[in-house]
Swiss-Prot record:
<dbReference type="GO" id="GO:1990904">
    <property type="term" value="C:ribonucleoprotein complex"/>
</dbReference>
<dbReference type="GO" id="GO:0003735">
    <property type="term" value="F:structural constituent of ribosome"/>
</dbReference>
<dbReference type="GO" id="GO:0005840">
    <property type="term" value="C:ribosome"/>
</dbReference>
<dbReference type="Pfam" id="PF00444">
    <property type="entry name" value="Ribosomal_L36"/>
</dbReference>
<dbReference type="InterPro" id="IPR000473">
    <property type="entry name" value="Ribosomal_bL36"/>
</dbReference>
<keyword id="KW-0687">Ribonucleoprotein</keyword>
<dbReference type="GO" id="GO:0005737">
    <property type="term" value="C:cytoplasm"/>
</dbReference>
<comment type="similarity">
    <text>Belongs to the bacterial ribosomal protein bL36 family.</text>
</comment>
<keyword id="KW-0689">Ribosomal protein</keyword>
<dbReference type="InterPro" id="IPR035977">
    <property type="entry name" value="Ribosomal_bL36_sp"/>
</dbReference>
<protein>
    <recommendedName>
        <fullName>Large ribosomal subunit protein bL36</fullName>
    </recommendedName>
</protein>
<dbReference type="GO" id="GO:0006412">
    <property type="term" value="P:translation"/>
</dbReference>
Amino acid sequence: MKVRVSVKPICEKCKVIKRKGVLRIICDNLKHKQRQK
């Protein structure tokens, strides 16, 4: 899980989800998991 100021989808399988006002990126590739600070 990377915590970043700006999150962007890295590949086609990355999904952007807003949970409790926090942007998250979920992907099959675990290296692509991100969360907005």
